[in-house]
Amino acid sequence: MKLAHKNNTGEEQSLEDHSFNVANKAREDAEFIGQGDLLFLLGMFHDLGKADEKFQNKLTKNPTMHVDHAYAGAKYLYEKIKIRLSAKGVDKATRLQFNEIVAYVIAAHHGMFDIVDLESEQHAYNKLRNRIARPKSDYHFDSDVTNFANFLETKLEHYGYQDLGMLIDKSFENYQQALSKLDCQDSSEEVYYQSCFVRLYLSLLKNADILDTINAYGLLINPLKQEEKIRLNRSYLEAIEKKYGEFGSPTTRLNEIRSQIAERVKSRGESDSTGIYRLDLPTGAGKTNLSMRYAFHQLVDQNKSRFFYITPFLSILEQNAAEIRKVTGDAGVLEHHSNVIRQTDD
């Protein structure tokens, strides 16, 4: 059995289990944006290099040894995608674009390497191509990595794919579908969005990989199910509406205006489609509460999954985070900035 993880008490996780756990979770998270097949492909092969004898020795005999395991999945898929899409008649430029995105995400899932340096210039390659093309004499790519990849591919029917060719086809369709929604004005804009795809795919892959690594020897983190997320969002909405209900009827002209704004924000939160909107109000208008009212109606009525509150000053952010928590409670709230201090017993 090939191992993906082994801890100091001897507990183990197989590479097969880890590969398909990550593939399934990444696909599940990416389905709502139509990228599920592509993320399954990335998840399935992201740790392919761990099949190498050198990495297996690291796990079982020499845990401090450094082994580059991220390159192998990129190298393997680079060739498979090239052969498959070429046979399908996909033009070279389009194929290379897709191929390099897939390879980069896998090769960079333990750290990005998009800075040009003397080494990459010396080889006349970008770092990605140099990394996957450079011979590694002490690795066992054909005997270990390719054989394990072939083994994984025999399991694909259990996950809805006839074979690797079908998975590559569907993954390419996912990417083309996403690309077709963009209206790029020039090549620089197109390249920018390609970099955005890379970071999106990396985020989805890393989320699934980290979760399964944490849970490798038993369930430690259990993400909220969709039904639980819906209930949580509804609880936010009920809480903010309760707060507005406690204000009572306005007794001054200023409070009448505030009440009118609040009702308009509520209506827009219920009906606004995806877009960029601006809430331009003076200090004292109650923008924190208004933002929550708008956002929580969007979460529930427009089926949004997240609400980000961003502000430029830490003092304001800390103050408003506290105000938000007074309404929502702690469940589902992540406060992330440089003044957050992790509290520990020691």
Tell what function each PLM region has:
Residues L3-G10, S14, L314, L334-D345:
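Conserved helicase motor
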Residues K2-A239:
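Accessory nucleic-acid engagement/destabilization modules that flank
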